[in-house]
Amino acid sequence: FMYLSTGAWNVTPTLRRFLHRNGYPKGTFLLTDWGPTPDRWFRSGSQHKVNTLKRLATEFPHIRWILIGDDGQRDPEIYNGFAVRYPHNVEAILIRNLTFGESVLSSGRVWGDNRARDITKGDLWLEGNDGTALYEQLKDRGLV
């Protein structure tokens, strides 16, 4: 497993404990640096994910990834773009639909239907309101 997040490296110990306590598999963390860049006050989390996914596709061309995210920020757009550019590297895209409150806390806005409407969702796309719903869909497709 690889955990790609816009979270900063300094949260690694907390993230590792959370994953362990909740039964997630061990894995590699692909986090970002926190702080300003030469041209902006904050780093682009979206660009971090795009660049890292591109690097993974280049370094591991034989692996088909299951991309898991939520609709609170840019995961649907990023994962869809990756699937279009690297279709041979994507086994499935799982998107958890956040509640209104979770979406506001995640990004300060609610966009779910507006932006997701512009994404062509193919056979790789799975959506659910929680991890159990997504897991059941993975089971139905024989991916777990």
Language-model regions, residue ranges each:
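C-terminal cap/substrate-recognition subdomain and adjoining C-terminal extension
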Residues: G7-V144
